[in-house]
């Protein structure tokens, strides 16, 4: 349910009393229709909020917001397309995520080859893998589907375009966007552990 999704993302940051670095958890919607509107990631609400923080700290100056984004790291906690055995033809069996194998990490997202995609750099992928492995987080590397058959976008490209290191990292789901979706409790728990480990890093 959406409650489980919010808890999986919100509780890790709430568990940290004194983060070593500035930590934020942002909840946005409208991703399926282009992330538009004041609650979508294309909105300027987050940039305005961060500018206000810099102003209240008395440190804001020209281009500081841009530099802040370029020095930021993000996990885009969108769900991953789990391999559905009934519709296996739309997945790349060697690059699909499976239920009960951990949170899915997608280095690349997009459709039709590389259109509207985001591609995390190898160094950032290695950084996240290191955090997960040192905290015993079960994870799997996956793609969203076969080229030109599956695939899909997330909000990762929006922040990546601002200079943020972004990696898609979410729970594999069967029957995504259907009235009845299926996930694994193990994968949800590994996502929770992974997000908390990331906030603590």
Identify the function of each model-found stretch.
Residues 14-26, 52, 171-201:
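His/Asp/Glu-rich mid-to-C-terminal helical/loop segments that flank catalytic regions of hydrolases
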Residues 17, 50-58, 84, 129-132, ...:
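Structural signal for hydrophobic packing residues in well-ordered secondary-structure cores
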Residues 12-18, 158-163:
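Alpha-helix C-terminal capping segments
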Residues 1, 36-43, 114, 118, ...:
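Hydrophobic alpha-helical scaffolding
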Residues 6, 41-49, 119-126, 150-153, ...:
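Conserved active-site and cofactor/substrate-binding residues in soluble primary-metabolism enzymes
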Residues 1-9:
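Single conserved hydrophobic/aromatic residue that forms the stacking wall/gate
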Residues 14-99, 104:
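Acidic/histidine-rich catalytic neighborhood of metal-dependent amide-processing enzymes
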């Amino acid at each position: 349910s959406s409650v489980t999704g919010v808890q999986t993302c919100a509780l890790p940051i709430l568990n940290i009393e004194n983060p070593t670095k500035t930590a934020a958890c942002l909840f946005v919607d409208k991703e399926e229709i282009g992330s538009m509107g004041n609650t979508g990631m294309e909105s300027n609400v987050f940039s305005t909020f961060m500018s206000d923080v810099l102003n209240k700290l008395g440190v804001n100056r020209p281009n500081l917001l841009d530099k802040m984004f370029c020095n930021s790291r993000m996990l885009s906690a969108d769900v991953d397309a789990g391999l559905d055995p009934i519709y296996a033809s739309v997945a790349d069996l060697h690059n699909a995520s499976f239920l009960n194998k951990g949170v899915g990490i997608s280095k690349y997202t997009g459709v039709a080859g590389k259109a509207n995609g985001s591609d995390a750099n190898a160094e950032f992928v290695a950084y996240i893998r290191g955090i997960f492995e040192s905290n015993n987080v079960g994870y799997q590397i996956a793609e969203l589907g076969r080229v030109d058959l599956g695939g899909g976008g997330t909000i990762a490209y929006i922040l990546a375009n601002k200079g943020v290191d972004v990696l898609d990292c979410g729970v594999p789901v069967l029957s995504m966007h259907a009235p009845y979706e299926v996930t694994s409790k193990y994968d949800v728990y590994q996502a929770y552990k992974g997000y908390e480990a990331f906030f603590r890093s």
